[in-house]
């Protein structure tokens, strides 16, 4: 599964945001939006992690600014204007500037410094709420926790109705053609059911039920962890399978090795590269958490 353009201007791989055929009416307001909640005691552990806090900042920052961040620790060293970043790129001064930040913060020359543009405009939460309401009905009917639909809809922004991934994934759930066809959707030159929200919700829910959750369960058991569909760490592992595919996540889990808890597994996955499980795959669950936390804050705001 190849979803979510992961937004780093420099060195960040990713794919385009999902399509959206939904247009909210003027009468709709966030007061009526449904939100599938994560238990606070489970969320608190991940809320404190620097990678999640970093993505929260990226989501809140407008595109006229950029964060200077140490890649491994997610230490946010500075916020600069997009104009300055553009000038650094144009005059090939980016690496020299990165080295200045390394020197100032005591990092080694080999450590990566990234420049990440703000993406507030990309995450349009007011378009997500009605979609979550509709998706919840479909996921409930199929017996899959609709929290997965909410995360996907939050991070596969509905803000670009005509975009598709370079790998051919299309729609609100960034479904690949073979996945869509497996669950009865038509994908042809004249018709693409991945544009149909109800049909694509059905396909995504069945994919979770038949493929993502069972594979995540087997991976957890391979590490001596008990799969629990109600635990946040397990749900995030499922999200990684949805995004990167079971084979790639399995390689990453094997590279992680022994862990004492599901939470430890997730933190190590965020720093593990194996096979095609790379930078964008690491970031997927971080961004899911960050967008969810920001969505909660947005729902509470005036």
Model features per residue range: what roles?
Residues 3-154, 163, 206, 210-231, ...:
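Cell-wall glycan-active module
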Residues 163-171, 191-195, 199, 229, ...:
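Alpha-helix capping and helix-loop boundary segments enriched in small/acidic/polar residues
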């Amino acid at each position: 599964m190849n979803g979510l353009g992961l937004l780093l201007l420099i060195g960040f791989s990713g794919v385009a945001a999902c399509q959206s055929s939904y247009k909210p009416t003027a009468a709709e307001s966030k007061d009526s939006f449904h939100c599938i909640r994560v238990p606070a005691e489970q969320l608190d552990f991940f809320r404190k992690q620097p990678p999640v806090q970093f993505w929260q900042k990226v989501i809140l920052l407008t595109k006229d600014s950029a964060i200077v961040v140490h890649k491994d620790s997610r230490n946010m060293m500075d916020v600069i204007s997009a104009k300055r970043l553009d000038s650094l790129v144009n005059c090939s001064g980016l690496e020299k500037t990165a080295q200045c930040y390394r020197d100032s913060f005591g990092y080694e020359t080999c450590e990566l410094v990234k420049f990440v543009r703000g993406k507030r405009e990309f995450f349009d939460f007011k378009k997500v709420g009605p979609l979550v309401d509709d998706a919840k009905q479909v996921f409930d009917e199929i017996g899959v926790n609709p929290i997965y639909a909410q995360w996907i809809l939050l991070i596969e922004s509905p803000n670009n109705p005509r975009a598709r991934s370079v790998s051919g994934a299309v729609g609100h759930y960034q479904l690949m053609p073979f996945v869509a066809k497996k669950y009865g959707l038509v994908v042809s030159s004249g018709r693409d059911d991945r544009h149909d929200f109800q049909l694509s919700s059905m396909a995504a829910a069945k994919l979770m039920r038949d493929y993502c959750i069972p594979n995540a369960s087997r991976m957890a058991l391979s590490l001596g962890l008990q799969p629990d569909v109600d635990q946040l760490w397990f749900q995030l592992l499922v999200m990684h399978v949805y995004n990167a595919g079971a084979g790639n996540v399995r390689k990453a889990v094997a590279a992680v090795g022994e862990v004492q808890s599901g939470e430890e597994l997730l933190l190590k996955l965020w720093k593990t590269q194996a096979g095609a499980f790379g930078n964008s795959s690491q970031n997927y669950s971080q961004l899911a958490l960050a967008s969810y936390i920001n969505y909660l804050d947005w729902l509470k705001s005036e």
